[in-house]
Amino acid sequence: MEFWSSAMSRNLGSGYEAIKSPWADYAIYSLPDASRIEACDRQPLMDAMNGIIAVNWQAAEPHWTATSSPFDQKYSLILVYDGSGLVAFSVYRILQMSAGLGIYRSGTEVLPAHQGRGLYGFFTAEVLKCSGAAERADGNVLYGWRTRNPIVWAANAKICEKVSPSLLDDAQDPALQAACVEMCTSLYPGKPLELPDMIMRGAYGHIKHHRQAYRGTASLVDAAMSRKIPNSADALFSVGYARV
């Protein structure tokens, strides 16, 4: 996978303004409209993003490509750099659902050496802030993600009042199940969900998640995932009511 990372950007460039960073050694850029990335910066940045994915996953081919680009106007981006280059990123979308505002976490990756520093939680807070979710008086925000990573599932479920599918109990929420189907149909036309477990078959045919030792809630989630989606190409599509 070296050819994906050889052109990694070492910074985003002076044409972009960094936001306030909680870490002295990270420069962070938050772009609600990913199409603001200039054409000349797109390939190096995409190579860097694919390079991180190739570290965290067994990847047969690049995940982000010119035909499946993270720089479409429909996406928003958060990028984290240190002195060596891009170390983490998050791609997300803001959706108008029939039940109101929707947020979808399209993909978040952090290099192993930078995991455990709170970047995932920072990304989540920034996504909620930029989406306008924090200003909603009713607090009714649908928050969706697709994964087979137990840590990611547990981290996202933690910020939700309820989640479908509910991996840790047998609770069923018809409204959330309907939201899962609506969001999935909007994002991935032609990719059906298997109800009630919200399984998306073949979601990760080109990449395979690196398994690891899990602790706490993540270990319980891992056990549930191992039962429901033993095939490494399958994923769970989840939607919850975000606490804002």
Pin down the residues of each PLM region:
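Hydrophobic, well-ordered beta-alpha structural blocks that scaffold small-molecule cofactor pockets
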Residues: 74, 78-80, 89-92, 121-122, ...
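A conserved beta-strand-loop-helix scaffold within acyl/acetyltransferase catalytic domains
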Residues: 30-112
